């Protein structure tokens, strides 16, 4: 299997792009479904980019910027809801939580029970939802500059509020993960904020779907041993799951 996937990747890299039919012809003893699964795996680890009817080579620098929040909020919403639901049982009444910015964490905030919680968030949309929909919860916004792409606040003022607040559980997001780079973000200021949160939180739960595997963004904010629980989906490669578990990460998977 590994040799076949390596051969597929090499062919796509050499030719720049290839159709599924063209790739199937390279392995006449394998079904088109098998080849499509191989392409899906290669796309998940960032080796190629899927296209309609085939795949193309991964371009240098591709995926190195944050996508717009409004582009992500309606993508894979059912999967994000299943992942967010798996995080809810970890929430206990009268606890202090940090909720990171992101489309999955927004769904988590929507599902959050009204349990007299103290919630700090870097996301203005999450703060607004908590303030208007969870009457027994207190909400604090980190402050700082608002990034229009990610709907996240960071920078000046955010460190001060973090220094004064103890966090029981941080529910984090990540823009990418690779074994070499760890968990990564696309903005330096947001990376600094995430690092501060990790230093204050008793427990860190990270929600990240398997499409982020192999996507290496510019700024590392966490290594595997700093994450207690990863909530992801069944698309996570078994080899990566095993290595995360070896480093002490509990992996919980939603059906993809």
Regions found by a protein language model. Name each.
Residues 2-6, 14-22, 26-29, 33-34, ...:
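HTH-adjacent hinge/linker in prokaryotic transcriptional regulators
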Residues 75-83, 100, 122, 154, ...:
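Short secondary-structure boundary/capping elements
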Residues 86, 90, 107, 111, ...:
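Rossmann-fold NAD(P)-dependent oxidoreductase module
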């Amino acid at each position: 299997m590994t040799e076949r996937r390596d051969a597929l990747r090499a062919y796509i890299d050499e030719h720049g792009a290839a159709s599924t039919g063209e790739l199937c012809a390279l392995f006449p003893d394998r079904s088109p479904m098998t080849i499509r699964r191989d392409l899906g795996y290669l796309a998940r680890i960032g080796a190629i980019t899927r296209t309609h009817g085939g795949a193309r080579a991964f371009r240098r620098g591709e995926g190195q910027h944050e996508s717009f929040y409004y582009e992500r909020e309606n993508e894979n919403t059912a999967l994000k809801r299943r992942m967010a639901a798996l995080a809810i049982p970890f929430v206990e009444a009268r606890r202090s939580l940090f909720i990171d910015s992101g489309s999955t964490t927004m769904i988590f905030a929507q599902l959050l029970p009204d349990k007299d919680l103290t919630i700090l968030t870097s996301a203005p949309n999450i703060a607004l939802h908590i303030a208007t929909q969870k009457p027994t919860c207190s909400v604090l916004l980190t402050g700082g500059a608002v990034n229009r792409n990610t709907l996240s606040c960071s920078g000046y003022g955010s460190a001060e509020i973090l220094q004064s607040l103890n966090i029981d559980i941080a529910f984090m997001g990540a823009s990418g993960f690779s074994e070499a780079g760890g968990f990564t973000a696309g903005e330096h200021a947001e990376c600094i904020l995430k690092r501060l949160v990790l230093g204050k939180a008793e427990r860190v739960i990270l929600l990240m779907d398997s499409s982020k595997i192999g996507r290496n963004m510019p700024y590392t904010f966490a290594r595997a041993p700093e994450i207690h629980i990863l909530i992801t989906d069944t698309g996570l490669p078994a080899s990566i799951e095993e290595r995360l578990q070896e480093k002490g990460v509990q992996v919980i998977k939603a059906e993809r």
